[in-house]
Design a protein with these regions (language model features):
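Conserved H-loop
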Residues: 40-44, 63
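GG-anchored amphipathic helix commonly corresponding to the ABC/SMC/Rad50 NBD signature/C-loop
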Residues: 1-8, 17-18, 22
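Short loop immediately C-terminal to the Walker-B catalytic DE motif
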Residues: 12-13
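Helical segment within the ABC ATPase nucleotide-binding domain
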Residues: 21-31
Length: 400
């Protein structure tokens, strides 16, 4: 045979990872005239072959509507050479996903791994969540748009990834990271029966709003109830969705602590802090404007204010005695586990008919009733409207 072909069907089965590494080396060292075709679900083997072999051709095979579709992928060293030294097995797992959700940090990972949330939304089990948004080389490895893997995906970002606010000039600036350059803007053509806007027109409208927008805010927390600002944010969110970017109004903490969950969040804070500390805080909290109340509470859960002021920045500007009081009731930390407990408590209150110990098994049984499932879904949508919108969009991306 002039050009022999060797076929491997899932060679990773029963192989220890060290042997997989040796197999990858053996494959890359064969005679150039020998063609090797490998069918695999091994992220480690795929990673090693991509890194070690410049001539490898990578294909993604998907079953859609009972038809096998084959897509030729790009190897990440081709379009992002620096990513070669950051790649891990977990990153390559994104090539085998049904849907990818790329997030910023630990809080989002904790949220989407909550068992009660996954029971309420079973399709979340088919969505893989990766911490990648804050690390460009890592995101480049997994980004389906760059790799041409044809896997549906969404990037979840905080609003401060898209805009910044100059407190002195009271002006906003658009950040370029998730906004395409003007000359790379997608022009959307439409016929007379279409009513949706051109992306280009949307972009120009956002830029005009950004230049002209002057907002009113409250100190020291940079709280804002200016309707013009929220119209600007809404336009930006709609535009970014066209580029597979779901932009939150503030942060993921803000999606959990919002004006609908204000009473629940305050009660949660009370249950998880010392009584004497909470009483001192409550005296101060009651004296605040209603917009400041929400912003301060959000900061205590490690979120940011409406105009992106962090807890650390804001607390420097308040009286030292008040600052000490606020420090004693601060509950949010990136790895404190409060998100899990917060959601657990919400679902426990929502399914209050469950007696004794609240468990995953009992909650799953409770939701077997269609009326009760609809009740819980309705309350979740009302209280966590931003999170519900995100989950609905993700679930709609799954090809059954």
């Amino acid at each position: 045979m002039k050009e022999p072909i060797v076929l491997f069907d899932e060679p990773e089965i029963s192989l220890h990872t060290n042997y997989l590494d040796e197999l990858a080396e053996a494959i890359t060292d064969v005679n150039a005239r020998l063609n090797i075709l490998i069918s695999t679900h091994s992220s480690r083997l795929t990673k090693n072959l991509i890194i070690e072999c410049d001539t490898i051709l990578l294909y993604n095979v998907k079953l859609v509507n009972r038809y096998s579709l084959v897509y030729r992928m790009k190897r990440f060293p081709q379009y992002s050479p620096t990513s070669k030294y950051r790649v891990a097995d977990d990153h390559i797992n994104a090539y085998f996903s049904r849907v990818n959700l790329f997030v910023e940090g630990e809080t989002e990972l904790e949220l989407f791994s909550n068992p009660y949330l996954r029971i309420l939304f079973p399709k979340l089990k088919k969505i893989d969540v990766f911490k990648a948004v804050s690390e460009k080389p890592v995101l480049n490895i997994m980004n389906p748009q760059l790799s041409n893997s044809q896997i549906p995906y969404l990037c979840l970002i905080d609003i401060d990834k898209a805009i910044s606010f100059d407190k002195t000039r009271k002006r906003f600036a658009l950040k370029p990271e998730y906004l395409p350059e003007d000359d790379k803007e997608r022009f959307r053509y439409r016929n007379k029966h279409e009513s949706s806007q051109y992306l280009y027109s949307q972009r120009k409208r956002i830029e005009a709003m950004q230049r002209k927008l002057h907002v009113h805010y409250y100190l020291p927390y940079l709280s804002c109830d200016d309707t013009n600002y929220y119209a600007f944010v809404s336009a930006l969110q709609k535009y970014l969705l066209s580029y597979n970017v779901f932009c939150l109004r503030t942060t993921i903490e803000g999606a959990l602590v919002n004006y609908r969950t204000l009473a629940f969040a305050l009660d949660f804070l009370k249950r998880n802090t010392k009584a004497q500390n909470f009483e001192k805080f409550n005296v101060y909290w009651k004296s605040l404007h209603k917009t400041d109340k929400l912003n301060l509470l959000r900061m205590l859960f490690n979120g940011k204010s409406d105009l992106l002021r962090s807890r650390k920045e804001a607390f420097k500007l308040v009286d030292s005695e008040i600052r000490d009081t606020l420090d004693t009731v601060t509950i949010g930390g990136k790895t404190s586990g409060w998100v899990s407990k917060y959601l657990d408590d919400f679902f426990k209150e929502t399914a209050d008919e469950i007696k004794d110990t609240f468990t995953e098994k009992k909650f799953r049984k409770y939701l077997e009733s269609e009326d009760k499932r609809k009740h819980v879904l309705r309350l979740f949508e009302e209280n966590f409207f931003e999170l519900y919108s995100l989950i609905e969009r993700l679930c709609g991306m799954i090809n059954e």
